[in-house]
Amino acid sequence: MKTSIAIVDYGMGNLRSVAQALKKAEPAADVAIVDTPAAIRAADRVVLPGQGAMPDCMRSLGESGLQEAVIEASRTKPLLGVCVGEQMLFDWSAEGDTKGLGLLPGKVVRFELDGRLQDDGSRFKVPQMGWNRVRQSQPHPLWDGVPDDAYFYFVHSYYVTPDNPAHTVGETAYGAPFTSAVARDNLFATQFHPEKSAEVGLRLYRNFVHWKP
């Protein structure tokens, strides 16, 4: 029986790219972009993407009527948050003083890198855009087959700061180390974009399809 994966369509996120990457990572999976609570409830696994500003994402999710179904899914099935979809899982964001879903304790803060210089003498830029390494700070099934310190693709100005250090499973350095992947029970989320991260991103998506938390 095929594993069904619902990509939540609340009007914000790189949905087609995520769907294409999941299908490429595991052709046997039944991947669908969905916009109804019933479709989220019917799926075996859920992906919560997000891009842009967290206030816009939270408002759109609330207006879509899908928020309660996402919260319900977070309690009962594997759920993967991507980029702003990761940030939305937390309690609060400094971006627009925005309340999150409160599924993971912690907050979202902005890079404070004004005037800071990188090792090559150039200034740090915010947002961080481009490839950067992810150190696997804790083992996890979604890291299976993904080399430690592999490069993933980032586009963001804000990052999560979990209250519980045990929830951090990936760290990246940009001015200072920050949490770039989190996990707890059936939740996993990344600040980076697996769908833009070549083979290591596809491997992570494939691991999500087969993950049995």
UniProtKB/Swiss-Prot annotation:
Documented EC number(s): 4.3.2.10, 3.5.1.2
Residues annotated as catalytic: 83 (nucleophile), 193, 195
Catalytic activity annotation: 5-[(5-phospho-1-deoxy-D-ribulos-1-ylimino)methylamino]-1-(5-phospho-beta-D-ribosyl)imidazole-4-carboxamide + L-glutamine = D-erythro-1-(imidazol-4-yl)glycerol 3-phosphate + 5-amino-1-(5-phospho-beta-D-ribosyl)imidazole-4-carboxamide + L-glutamate + H(+); L-glutamine + H2O = L-glutamate + NH4(+)
Pathway(s) served: Amino-acid biosynthesis; L-histidine biosynthesis; L-histidine from 5-phospho-alpha-D-ribose 1-diphosphate: step 5/9
A Pfam family the protein falls into: GATase
MF terms (GO), sorted A to Z: glutaminase activity; imidazoleglycerol-phosphate synthase activity; lyase activity
Alphabetized PROSITE patterns for the sequence: GATASE_TYPE_1 (PS51273)
Principal location class: cytoplasm
Biological role: IGPS catalyzes the conversion of PRFAR and glutamine to IGP, AICAR and glutamate. The HisH subunit catalyzes the hydrolysis of glutamine to glutamate and ammonia as part of the synthesis of IGP and AICAR. The resulting ammonia molecule is channeled to the active site of HisF.
Protein name (record): Imidazole glycerol phosphate synthase subunit HisH
Gene that specifies this protein: hisH
